[in-house]
Curated annotation (Swiss-Prot):
UniProt-annotated catalytic positions: 367 (proton donor)
Pfam families in the record: Glyco_hydro_47
Name used for this protein in its record: Probable mannosyl-oligosaccharide alpha-1,2-mannosidase 1B
GO BP: carbohydrate metabolic process; ERAD pathway; protein glycosylation
Reaction equation(s) it catalyzes: N(4)-(alpha-D-Man-(1->2)-alpha-D-Man-(1->2)-alpha-D-Man-(1->3)-[alpha-D-Man-(1->2)-alpha-D-Man-(1->3)-[alpha-D-Man-(1->2)-alpha-D-Man-(1->6)]-alpha-D-Man-(1->6)]-beta-D-Man-(1->4)-beta-D-GlcNAc-(1->4)-beta-D-GlcNAc)-L-asparaginyl-[protein] (N-glucan mannose isomer 9A1,2,3B1,2,3) + 4 H2O = N(4)-(alpha-D-Man-(1->3)-[alpha-D-Man-(1->3)-[alpha-D-Man-(1->6)]-alpha-D-Man-(1->6)]-beta-D-Man-(1->4)-beta-D-GlcNAc-(1->4)-beta-D-GlcNAc)-L-asparaginyl-[protein] (N-glucan mannose isomer 5A1,2) + 4 beta-D-mannose; N(4)-(alpha-D-Man-(1->2)-alpha-D-Man-(1->2)-alpha-D-Man-(1->3)-[alpha-D-Man-(1->3)-[alpha-D-Man-(1->2)-alpha-D-Man-(1->6)]-alpha-D-Man-(1->6)]-beta-D-Man-(1->4)-beta-D-GlcNAc-(1->4)-beta-D-GlcNAc)-L-asparaginyl-[protein] (N-glucan mannose isomer 8A1,2,3B1,3) + 3 H2O = N(4)-(alpha-D-Man-(1->3)-[alpha-D-Man-(1->3)-[alpha-D-Man-(1->6)]-alpha-D-Man-(1->6)]-beta-D-Man-(1->4)-beta-D-GlcNAc-(1->4)-beta-D-GlcNAc)-L-asparaginyl-[protein] (N-glucan mannose isomer 5A1,2) + 3 beta-D-mannose
Gene for this chain: mns1B
Amino acid sequence: MHLPSLSVALALVSSSLALPQTVLPESDVSSHAAAVKEAFSHAWDGYMKYAFPHDELLPISNSYGDSRNGWGASAVDALSTAIVMRNATIVNQILDHIAKIDYSKTSDTVSLFETTIRYLGGMLSGYDLLKGPAADLVKDSTKVDMLLQQSKNLGDVLKFAFDTPSGVPYNNINITSHGNDGATTNGLAVTGTLVLEWTRLSDLTGDQEYAKLSQRAESYLLAPQPSSGEPFPGLVGSEISIQTGQFTNGFVSWNGGSDSFYEYLMKMYVYDPKRFATYKDRWVAAAESSIDHLASSPASRPDLTFLATYNKGSLGLSSQHLACFDGGSYLLGGTVLDRADLIDFGLKLVDGCAETYHQTLTGIGPESFGWDEKSVPADQKEFYERAGFYVQSGAYILRPEVIESFYYAYRVTGKKQYRDWVWNAFVNINKYCRTGSGFAGLTDVNAVNGGNRYDNQESFLFAEVMKYAYLTHAPGMSPISIADEDKANESRG
């Protein structure tokens, strides 16, 4: 997964939390924010010139891709960031495009998960912002109302995926034939990263069907069966039977495939504490169990902390860029619950993931890394001794999770170091990934110049990387309160 992101009204963190802030000199704030806006506009202009209305820009060949069903994923994913940046021109361009999308038509298989987090999340967050703090950006209110109608249209197209014996949905579906790929299981993250957007859709439309469908699927994750599917309190396996709703393994991880299930537990509680107190309880159990059973420090760098995986009595000493949202999740949960211990542990996780950026040649973190001293590649022994990890996959595909957690750390602590880390990451992405028309991924972050480049610009560059970088440096921490900032972060990206 990419992330999340936060999610719609999503992680409605109340501004009454009174998070501490530090203030940059206005000139520095303005120049950093302006640089991020320029990078966003650069990527957007390239997308519009060479790829619109397709899903993504191919920023080296100056062509386009349609990996997300050809509905214009980059445009929809960019909406909330364009709103936060108060770019009315781009906002209205995107609204005009969304009004023309026919979500009932595609020649490709549809991913329920990806379509929910990019399209449904993108439209709902845009709707909330344009009905609230950014209402002045769009003069024609019917264009904003269209976002909710299109969200409902999309939900109606997708909802047959939940028509299974258990209510656990199929992920890969054919919206024309109402068929599926014949899978017997669905993943933890895929099943557990629908409930926020689908619940929000019900709350906005008054039609409870969407919430009921997603919450029924979630119910199996909140009360896992059999007991082997929950090796530690709150920590559950990675695969669920579509037929029965039971867990089919006990593989525990905060990595891709499981990650955003844990992320959404706390965000559901923040969204509505009265309705979703159980989600909070499950997140707390998972967070505490992770501290007790998954926290791991490299032998060469005992000052660092990562979350290991667990399976059948053994820890796996490896992690992913995707998992680096974990520090931000602890910081959000710890702040909302007034738990200093969870905040402190979250900052340890942030520091660990920060090193995956600080130690590479590009200053950008790898797709996956390990710290098992018995498995260090021969050509990385010196690097491991210094850095505390070794690179497993050196790719960088414009993922946001590390910057996301830096952003949380800055908002929670007010410490300049975290804002600087966001800025340094942004500068390095701008340096090594930028092309003439946009931003490309890197094949090896620990090679000179990042190795070669991937000819693809993921939509979550717009939805998350640029948004977190901008919000960290926006003058006055942006004119939108922290509650509304989190509305903006609907799309996980």
